[in-house]
Amino acid sequence: MEQTYQYAWIIPFLPLPVPMLIGLGLLLFPTATKSLRRMWAFQSVLLLSIVMIFSMNLSIQQINSSSVYQYVWSWIINNDFSLEFGYLIDPLTSIMSILITTVGILVLIYSDNYMSHDHGYLRFFAYMSFFSTSMLGLVTSSNLIQIYIFWELVGMCSYLLIGFWFTRPVAAKACQKAFVTNRVGDFGLLLGILGFYWITGSFEFRDLFQIFNNLISTNQVNFLFVTLCAVLLFAGAIAKSAQFPLHVWLPDAMEGPTPISALIHAATMVAAGIFLVARLLPLFIVIPHIMNFISLIGIITVFLGATLALAQKDINRGLAYSTMSQLGYMMLALGMGSYRSALFHLITHAYSKALLFLGSGSVIHSMETLVGYCPKKSQNMVLMGGLTKHVPITKNSFLLGTLSLCGIPPLACFWSKDEILNDSWLYSPIFAIIAWSTAGLTAFYMCRIYLLTFEGHLNVHFQNYSGKRNTPLYSISLWGKEGSKISNKNFRLVTLLKMNKTGRPSFFSNRVYKIDENVRNMTPPFLSIPNFGNIKTSLYPYESDNTMLFPILILFIFTLFVGFLGIPLNQDVDILTKWLTPSINLLHKNSNNSIDWYEFCKDALFSVSIASFGIFIAFFLYKPVYSSFQNLDLINSFFKMGPRRNFYDKIKNAIYDWSYNRGYIDAFYGTFFIVGTRKLAEFTHFFDRRIIDGIPNGVGLISFFVAEVIKSVGGGRISSYLFFYFSYVSIFLVIYYFLNL
């Protein structure tokens, strides 16, 4: 076993040859390298598979022996400073390694077909392999210096992948936004690292925790300074894991290819922030104020992410806000000290969200056969619907991921989310109410995404939903500001509404659907992908190829069974608790991990009831209009009541405006930070040119003009010089006389 741990240093470096060789090949032998591009994809999968097997071996040994291994090399040693590099293998490292490698392998296999049309195929695989290397290096780091180095590499890879299609202005802006937002958090992380080094004199986790705990117990530190340093450390996690208020980059990150979103949201970038807080939890847990702050940020993010997901029309952005909300649950659990629950939810959410994103990519891939390559159309749920019979495997997989995220037993997220919800009651009733309410919102918006995508008719074939020939295709304002040139009225939250004779929207009414004769020519190809120029569109989507379906089916199985890791089946301790024993003992001495099944079932019944209520509301509002509900006069009469209807519309519109406008947070940042910075820059430029440069330039000009005046006065005649001389002497004498009176 010792020998296995000694070779664990190769974990982050095994995937590294692929991006290096691809880069050299494209520089030196571009034609040959491109002709063998499938070989490079195979090597990426092969090397990451070796890392996965190695990580599984380490995990099995840790479960059986509850051991922690650390190896350190000292590079610079003197009396005052030592720089050490090494690797740490503990339960957190092994969990993250398995998560990164399993999801990474499936995403790479999926991407082989998804990116086959793209000229950037090799560049994509180089970025993805380097992304995996950076993340594996992050989770195996044994000190804060290594953490920061790999932290920045993860940020760089995310910048490259989000802006993969950099010729699209939207993608270029999105990667810049992600880069700048994360720089704010990374600067705080750097200051926090330096602050704790100044306090403890060490970067190594083991020494850092021990020295800091001793200083706290003997009251030898300034608590205000310590809290400030902890907040700065946490700022890095806030930015990386898209927590409020540095969450604004996450929905824009959907401008990259969908497999990138699956990797970022499941196992790499956003998981890095959760990993950092979990790694530093022994440091944070002795500072009560920072733990309260972590839980506060978590609960705000939980609710904010759920509300922002309510009215998204882009399928990937809806899933992105879902990720934000679920990461908030993990951060809330860490702030409450529920280390095991946070990591449990990290595992279950990773596989469920990877399943959803790969399913979303399969849907987008199928829609591109109808609308061509145009993300605004292929990812727009207004053009979807009725996909059940066309993509049945994708539909069933997406449904399973949806139900898992909703918290329906016995799927993965049910077990982990319930633990966090139950712990929240013990921590704060207010936080618990918000967390449980958000569970209902989660069920609502996830079911909404599913219904709009797969149920009903294939909406891309319909010219409009009002029976008017001149109404443009994007006339339904529910789906955003996509540009109705005729109708300016807002139909929000509830899909497929129609104006009746009184000018009010009606929920259920007969519609005349018009087939768009120009459906084949709806979308011009995008310039960055020339292969799409000659793509032939069809009238109906079709199921993705087996290369894309295989990873989806594997994640389908994971989502079904991974939740049982945390459930004690015919044994005293579940596998996850046994796995995490060294870390749990470090945080909570003599902790009791037994489960009260009666309390669990009671709380589970309550949580499932809330989720079921959210699903019912989604079905009530978003079930296709041709369903049996349209004949229920009771429902129609209820919504046609005057005052009640007006009140309902106001609430609906307010929710829609909040959600569609991203809570006005982006607008606030744009007004007060971007515009403010520009105004400050303009003022600084004016001050520099007119004041700083103006003073010396003005003195020079005045001297020049005075000299010119004096020069013009003197004409070279001695009589003139004598006249001015006696004049000045006379003036001087007069002044002197009056001063001495």
UniProtKB/Swiss-Prot annotation:
Record's catalysed reaction(s): a plastoquinone + NADH + (n+1) H(+)(in) = a plastoquinol + NAD(+) + n H(+)(out); a plastoquinone + NADPH + (n+1) H(+)(in) = a plastoquinol + NADP(+) + n H(+)(out)
Gene3D superfamilies, A to Z: 1.20.5.2700
Gene Ontology biological process terms from the UniProt entry: ATP synthesis coupled electron transport; electron transport coupled proton transport
EC number in record: 7.1.1.-
Annotated membrane topology: Multi-pass membrane protein
Cystines in this chain: none
GO CC annotations, alphabetized: chloroplast thylakoid membrane
Domain of life: Eukaryota
Keyword set, alphabetical order: Chloroplast, Membrane, NAD, NADP, Plastid, Plastoquinone, Quinone, Thylakoid, Translocase, Transmembrane, Transmembrane helix, Transport
Transmembrane segments: 9-29, 40-60, 89-109, 125-145, 147-167, 185-205, 219-239, 258-278, 289-311, 327-347, 354-374, 396-416, 425-445, 549-569, 605-625, 721-741
Gene Ontology MF terms in the entry: NADH dehydrogenase (ubiquinone) activity; quinone binding
InterPro entries: NADH_UbQ_OxRdtase_chlpt_su5_C (IPR002128), NADHpl_OxRdtase_5_subgr (IPR018393), ND/Mrp_TM (IPR001750), NU5C-like (IPR003945), Proton_antipo_N (IPR001516)
Cell compartments where the protein resides: Plastid, Chloroplast thylakoid membrane
UniProt enzyme class: translocase
Physiological role: NDH shuttles electrons from NAD(P)H:plastoquinone, via FMN and iron-sulfur (Fe-S) centers, to quinones in the photosynthetic chain and possibly in a chloroplast respiratory chain. The immediate electron acceptor for the enzyme in this species is believed to be plastoquinone. Couples the redox reaction to proton translocation, and thus conserves the redox energy in a proton gradient.
Stored NCBIfam families: NDH_I_L, PRK06590.1
Subunit structure: NDH is composed of at least 16 different subunits, 5 of which are encoded in the nucleus.
Protein family (similarity comment): Belongs to the complex I subunit 5 family.
Name of this chain's protein: NAD(P)H-quinone oxidoreductase subunit 5, chloroplastic
Organism, as annotated: Symphyotrichum cordifolium (Heart-leaved aster)
Encoding gene per record: ndhF
